[in-house]
Regions:
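Short acidic-hydrophobic catalytic motif
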Residues: 1-171
Length: 171
């Protein structure tokens, strides 16, 4: 119960201070559609923890392509993956089987972004930071942190567990 209360306060804080509805979306496809709708205002960092999952599909990849992702994680069980996207422009992206992946970029606005992915057997973690401040849910699956360039702050941090058919959403 305490964990839920803490999570609810965190979400309320993000909504109150960033003013965005991303935090209300828990469906994978709808989330990427919402990102695409306001892509010019977002810096998006993605990192996989554990595995992209056995339930990652070509349809989910098509959703991710909306924001500039070019690596298809379908059938990439145990792969590390990380990407940084600024305003729809892919700044960095990498993937490899059972390898720690870390990508870094500085945006045109001067925001330093780092995204690190560690599959299960090589660390089982993620780390995403904007200007040195870490923000990652760090749960199994696709971890996404979104920075709003107009507000100059993180407006959402979410994980979609693509290893289960229900594609559970965690914040």
């Amino acid at each position: 119960m305490i964990a839920n209360a803490t999570a609810n306060r965190k979400i309320a804080h993000l909504v109150e201070f960033a003013g965005f509805s991303l935090t209300a979306i828990s469906d994978f496809s709808k989330y990427f559609k919402a990102l695409q709708a306001n892509i010019e205002n977002y810096i998006i960092a993605i990192a996989v923890k554990d595995t992209p999952g056995l339930c990652f599909t070509d349809a989910l990849y098509a959703d991710m392509q909306r924001i500039g992702v070019t690596v298809n994680l379908t059938k990439k069980h145990w792969y590390g993956y990380a990407a940084i996207i600024d305003g729809g422009k892919l700044l960095a992206e990498d993937a490899a089987y059972q390898k720690v992946i870390s990508v870094k970029a500085t945006t045109e606005d001067g925001v330093a972004v780092v995204a690190t992915s560690k599959p299960l057997k090589v660390g089982n973690a993620t780390a995403i930071s904007f200007n040195g401040i870490g923000r990652s849910v760090s749960r199994r699956g696709i971890n996404i942190t979104v920075y709003d360039k107009t507000k100059k702050c993180v407006c959402d941090s979410v994980c979609f567990d693509t290893h289960v058919k229900s594609i559970d959403c965690h914040r």
